[in-house]
């Protein structure tokens, strides 16, 4: 059985880890970094860039450089959070035919899972380069507060990238695995506060150790899937834009190029202010008007940044209270607080969390890598490489159906340990009703329309009977990935209808298969491109070495041969500028044929050089046999 890799598919950065024996190892990507920016760029010449190369060219290609795609995955275009992003993102967010939020990439509507798949492909390639073997299976993490549609869309992204997603696990749970696996922790209750690039989660987790076996049980989870470092950046960007407008009278919001430079500078300033008290945002030639170029130079203090984002940090505190309440615990019951996600490096975040829990968060967990490590550990559990670990996760939101009067009736309450199964019997609302519609919902509100609709299906063929008589058993079954399967059965007729909940939107099987095929076709074209580059390099090398040999042969090379070689060199040189690998190989072959005489001369010259150096060594050796001696003239005594 091959390795199951662990992938933290983050909003801002992604990370991949594997189990190396009994320890998890975070892998470096091709650029030598342990994390990869979750940025994808589509260049003018049709190339797809992922990670650092995509980030580097963002300033010159803002409309086709996509970031923070995780905020759109599994969401509807009309969602309030999506509409907020529509107005601030440099790229184009559009409505798909089914109402989902998709992206317009160079005039083509593209689904978020398809774009996230590019990041997953890079993670897959990083692992394959390290292991030296194909990788086909992965554990991928998601925010604990992701709903069913978002989890399903993440699995779809994995499939498009050529990965069988063996398990979807929650990010805070993964971080707890990373924290608790190699520590003699005994029985402890920990709080994992996870503030990443685009999402926020809090999970209360109990680690029990009995006879060396550790059980990680999630007691409660809460969060906000649209709160993260990107929002902190946006606050700082808006402040800088407003200051510049006050000073220069120019609104940079209308200039995508300037906004992209500003985004980079704001992110850098935010990071610097975690260790410094103030920083300069210095952007020469940010824009120009009739009077000439304009430069931005604005001082930002840590206190200013904190005042801009204080309400965002406070927004993360409310879910902490709810999670503790749901777990039936008080602050004093928490033994350790673990911070995960890059945004938790901000001193203000650390201070607020410490104030809430009444204790300093632990500093021995890497906030950027813990989640990927935990995913790799879960991969190890699934392959049997990691033993004595049991993970009990929960469903983050209540699941139920719409019943008479537009009410949501929950079948499975939030924070129920998964996998789980629950059945309940319902009946008809009208006399002689022959069909019922099962409308599946996720959320905590009483009114059905205030919750997230996960889909609906019909159960037909109910025998005519007075209202309230037929018995329809509805069963909810949540698997270990947190994905829901629903069935409805008429107990009288035995008729049954089952569905796996795919978001009423989401990607259908046909679309996923099409995207998988496109990804495979891209992989094939990538392979062909790589082979073309290798052939070009060989051709370049042959050009260079042949020219050098012609020069060294001088007059020894007959004029006819020289002309034939020159003509073959010119033909190869022109072929190297094209895209035809077979033609380059043919021209290389033709040059080799024309150069036969040249090869003979080169071999003779080489043999002569060898002989010459052998003679020189031999004469040196003869000289070495001569012993230098001093003679003293002895005169006979007379």
UniProtKB/Swiss-Prot annotation:
Q: What induces it?
A: By stress conditions e.g. heat shock.
The modified positions for Phosphothreonine read 199
List, as start-end ranges, the regions of compositional bias called Low complexity.
602-620
Gene3D superfamilies in the cross-refs = 1.20.1270.10, 3.30.420.40, Actin, Chain A, domain 4, Substrate Binding Domain Of DNAk, Chain A, domain 1
Pfam families attached to this UniProt entry: HSP70
- According to the lineage, what is the superkingdom? Bacteria
Is the Phosphoprotein keyword given for this protein?
yes
InterPro entries named in the record? ATPase_NBD, Chaperone_DnaK, Heat_shock_70_CS, HSP70_C_sf, HSP70_peptide-bd_sf, Hsp_70_fam
Per UniProt, the keywords (alphabetical) are: ATP-binding, Chaperone, Nucleotide-binding, Phosphoprotein, Stress response
Instruction: Check the record and name the PROSITE patterns matching this protein.
Output: HSP70_1, HSP70_2, HSP70_3
Name one molecular function that GO assigns to this entry. unfolded protein binding
Residues passing through the membrane, by range = none
Q: Which family does the entry's similarity section mention? A: Belongs to the heat shock protein 70 family.
This chain belongs to which protein, by name? Chaperone protein DnaK
Gene encoding the protein: dnaK
